[in-house]
Amino acid sequence: MSQEKYIMAIDQGTTSSRAIIFNQKGEKVSSSQKEFPQIFPHAGWVEHNANQIWNSVQSVIAGAFIESSIKPSQIEAIGITNQRETTVIWDKKTGVPIYNAIVWQSRQTAPIAEQLKQDGHTKMIHEKTGLVIDAYFSATKIRWILDHVPGAQERAEKGELLFGTIDTWLVWKLTDGAVHVTDYSNAARTMLYNIKDLTWDDEILELLNIPKDMLPEVKSNSEIYGKTAAFHFYGGEVPISGMAGDQQAALFGQLAFEPGMVKNTYGTGSFIIMNTGDEMQLSSNNLLTTIGYGINGKVHYALEGSIFIAGSAIQWLRDGLKMIETSPESEQFALASTSDDEVYVVPAFTGLGAPYWDSNARGSVFGLTRGTSKEDFVKATLQSIAYQVRDVIDTMQVDSGIDIQQLRVDGGAAMNNMLMQFQADILGIDIARAKNLETTALGAAFLAGLAVGYWEDMDALKELNATGQLFKASMNESRKEKLYKGWKRAVKATQVFTQEEDADDDAK
């Protein structure tokens, strides 16, 4: 067998871990996936067992080798991408976590976040970290664990405990405890990292009483952090040389290297990230400012908008309403709709994300008539995804002053041609669907490969994930704006409905 060299990407997600082996053309050669248990101790709490995450990663590494007959010695480098914000604290000597990993979705630390807001720290934290104060980010999760595990604060102050997001935990495990690092993109999601000065922020650490010794060293997204311990990589001592949080890895995998380039991943929710270049731009409109990636001594900042419900709206049609049997079927139903009636579905099942950040909003439907069909309802649900993306894109253009020309897309719902065409129409710009939709893992592989010379430079990557299909806007301007104004009215009415409910409760 030829000793061709490859890059392995470890993609550690919220519900499963994957290992994917890529060749020099950026093609997937082998992959393995393993789910792991979700832990829900109380309503709104979401936790993982960090050792189960590690076990799942070991399993998929083996699986990728078994499927392909590729040997560990053929792996030139490893890239890691991960669910962001999820927090692990472990014993420095034994490597044993002192509590479950608190997952990014978990709301158990919301009271800590609310207290920070009430104490007037919103502006300071926003200006330093680019983030809003929220339980979403790692800072409140660290504080919660130190508060709730007996003796944890004292042990942390003695230097006996280490903190890490999942990237840090995996590197620490793969190197058998030799390396305690994170990267710019993951550090930027902790709410402890000053993204302007590129340092852990002493004022925020003091405010939350988090000992600095717990924190990992912050590195660029593409450099050799360490090598795998041979017994953790089937005899191979392989450089770990690329790391990025999942959405930033997708930005890199989409080759969005220039300011103004934007990608959207249509997953359960939708995550829209714009490369804003080397200038940190704080949003005035509820978008997050973060670090896209740092490479070759230069940091690229980004604006991010999160939409809570995208692909999960299609799952709702399938599992909740039983209107469709499979998710891909939604496209055929939508195309069969012959009505021009303006039906709007506002899928605020868990509130509205960017740019509204209205956690009280709930789902609603407007514009139904006796003539409304199942096909019309399915079409309106798909269109709601595109309308929400426009909400964020319009806001990004205002915040950045950049006129967006193209949206690069990936994720499961990006395979829906009807949705992609409507997305192009309602935005009035081109939609470029990646040829390789594995953009998150590919981004981690690219970062790792660049650090070891597997790919020469970023220009060499541009041929490796070309546009698979381009969707061009074809709707006339007046129709486009009429539809979008209807959407804005529907969102406003949805918010008013829950506001009036709150007012009724207050009156009681």
UniProtKB/Swiss-Prot annotation:
Q: Can you provide one Gene Ontology molecular function annotated for this UniProt record?
A: glycerol kinase activity
Pfam assignment, any one: FGGY_N
EC no.?
A: 2.7.1.30
Report residues binding ATP.
14-16, 268, 311, 315, 412
Q: Could you say which residues bind ADP here?
A: 14, 18, 268, 311, 412, 416
Q: Which residues bind sn-glycerol 3-phosphate?
A: 14, 84-85, 136, 246
Residues binding glycerol are 84-85, 136, 246-247
Quote the PTM field: The phosphoenolpyruvate-dependent sugar phosphotransferase system (PTS), including enzyme I, and histidine-containing protein (HPr) are required for the phosphorylation, which leads to the activation of the enzyme.
The source's superkingdom equals Bacteria
Supply the enzyme class, top level. Answer: transferase
User: Which residues are recorded as modified (Phosphohistidine)?
Assistant: 232
From the UniProt record, give one GO term of the biological process aspect.
glycerol-3-phosphate metabolic process
Query: What is catalyzed by this enzyme?
Result: glycerol + ATP = sn-glycerol 3-phosphate + ADP + H(+)
Gene Ontology CC terms, in alphabetical order: cytosol
Per the record, the pathway is: Polyol metabolism; glycerol degradation via glycerol kinase pathway; sn-glycerol 3-phosphate from glycerol: step 1/1
State what inhibits or activates this protein: Activated by phosphorylation and inhibited by fructose 1,6-bisphosphate (FBP).
Q: Which UniProt keywords apply?
A: ATP-binding, Glycerol metabolism, Kinase, Nucleotide-binding, Phosphoprotein, Transferase
Question: What family is reported?
Answer: Belongs to the FGGY kinase family.
Q: How does it assemble?
A: Homotetramer and homodimer (in equilibrium).
Q: What does this protein do?
A: Key enzyme in the regulation of glycerol uptake and metabolism. Catalyzes the phosphorylation of glycerol to yield sn-glycerol 3-phosphate.
The protein in question is named Glycerol kinase
Q: Which organism is it from?
A: Streptococcus pyogenes serotype M3 (strain ATCC BAA-595 / MGAS315)
Lineage, highest ranks first: Bacteria, Bacillati, Bacillota, Bacilli, Lactobacillales
Q: Name the gene for this chain.
A: glpK
